[in-house]
Amino acid sequence: RALGPLIPSRLFDQFFGEGLLEYDLLPLFSSTISPYYRQSLFRSVLESGISEVRSDREKFTIMLDVKHFSPEDLSVKIIDDFVEIHGKHSERQDDHGYISREFHRRYRLPSNVDQSAITCSLSSDGMLTFSGPKVQANMDPSHSERPIP
């Protein structure tokens, strides 16, 4: 569900094993702005992997931040009417120690997406873009009757 007319539908719960920083461990009352404001929560959402799904008349697009994965760590498949995106990398050292990450996302494709024309690309900044054009059904404008069950 969209959060507003200007913000498309997004999944904000994709942290992919981000490390904790010092201010993540501070109690709520340590904020100088307000005892009820916790900056790190909002910051974490903005800097985490975000999935965005867009569907308009012309195309269906999925954009997924996979910056922690190399192309060899990713798998994208179409199975029936679903696109499945899987990412997994073995244990690596980062700023906070050692970490391994794995995720699995499954999205339903609209029935009018041309599956034979789907493309998938990975940008240099780690944004995976999956896109497919929609086909228009051949409808006779003079005959618009449709039974409703």
Swiss-Prot record:
Residues annotated as transmembrane: none
Subcellular locations according to the entry: Cytoplasm; Nucleus
Domain of life: Eukaryota
InterPro entries assigned: A-crystallin/Hsp20_dom, Alpha-crystallin/HSP_16, Alpha-crystallin/sHSP_animal, Alpha-crystallin_N, HSP20-like_chaperone
Keywords, alphabetical: Cytoplasm, Eye lens protein, Metal-binding, Nucleus, Zinc
Biological process per Gene Ontology, one example term: protein refolding
Single Gene Ontology MF annotation: structural constituent of eye lens
Function description: Contributes to the transparency and refractive index of the lens. May act as a chaperone, preventing aggregation of various proteins under a wide range of stress conditions.
Annotated protein name in UniProt: Alpha-crystallin A chain
Species, as recorded: Eudromia elegans (Elegant crested-tinamou)
Gene designation: CRYAA
